[in-house]
Amino acid sequence: MGEDPRTPHRVFLRSAYSRSGSFGTHPFPVRHALHNLQSEAESRPDPFIRRTTPQALDSSRQEVASLLHVPKNEVVLVKNATTGVHTILHNLGLKKGDAVVYFDTVYGAVERMLFSSVEMTSMALKKVKYRLPLHPEELVTKFVDAVRAARDEGLNVRAAVFETIVSMPGVRFPFERLVEVCRAEGVLSLIDGAHGIGHIPLDLGTLQPDFFTSNCHKWLYTPRGCAVLYVPLRHQHLIRTTLPTSWGYIPAPDSPSTGASTMQTAGGGKSAFESLFEFVATTDDTPYLCIPAAMKFRRETCGGDERIFTYLEELANEAADIVAGELGTEVMQEPGIKHWKESLLRKCGMTTVRLPIPIQDGTDISPDAGKKRVCMPLPADEVPGVCRWMQDTLVDEYDTFLPVFPHGGWLWARLSAQVYLEKKDFEWVAPILKDLCERVGKKSQPEAKL
């Protein structure tokens, strides 16, 4: 890994380095496949969309189904994980008296989606509040307490939304245990696995969550936007519409009849669930069709999925120790851990390092008073500007990017490993982060660009 996949010719753009954790990137072989598909679509749009695409979608769905260890007829493709989560929640028919449980570190767009659902359905939300770092089993206990407290209020807890890997802070979530607990409590498990497929080993056939979605463009090396949505056969009767509703819509038995679809495709013998997602409005779906090319790259250039998983985890954790050592701080992990391999939170290709910049976030930071810092606690209203300035400066002065964000009374930085990165890349960025922190401490930052 590291430089190996880049020789004799680089297969990723150099400017993509260190920037793929948020939106993903893809190698040149996949880009060539994308451009060829787009050229074919433009030269013969009707045959391509009506005939070529359904068959090619089947090949892509088979690839991701095999990677997730589930049947092809239980996976479809959507634009992104946010769309996947929204599609499931929209189809559950949530109403007043129902509740959805979610966690404090939920992805921001998903939380806004939940707020919107409350406005439209009058359902209730119950947030599991917590502060990292802590032991994963404590999270599970807090979740069970939240479910039972909601029931004590007379609410029907329909579903729980949680991640495979939290976006910020970048830590692995105890999603396997939460699926077990949801099953025991009679709550539908909806996994937002945005940072899942291609990043960590996933066996949904064994895990058996109720719903799962994951971006292929973040870690599987497909173009944007491309995500998998998994719905096991036992729940497919619940899913009757896409977002937006399109030609595959499955009306309720008492609904008015609709005319025959003008988008009948060449792919026969499919379930209503599969057909539902085969054509969703008119968009460029060629990223979906690049999954076979991405999987070929992973096998032939990177040495296969297991090698990728191992490389990402080891590099991310080595990188975190390098950066924390330079800053004189620590990596986010469970209390009392002596080596990163003992940590569940660090068992992935993203890690989170504390910056020596305390903040006034309304919490009591006195227990952390002995930790290294370069300045007095930042007022809460200054934190967004400082984070933006640090991120802007990383781009403008160093042509790289790392998310900087507040959590639990401190600023933190998220590190993402990738197959095109290696140890020296993080040895390079560590003193840069240290310099930025010292500049914040000296109050030398200019007005952040909005």
Task: Go through the PLM ranges and name each one.
Residues 1-450:
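Pyridoxal 5′-phosphate
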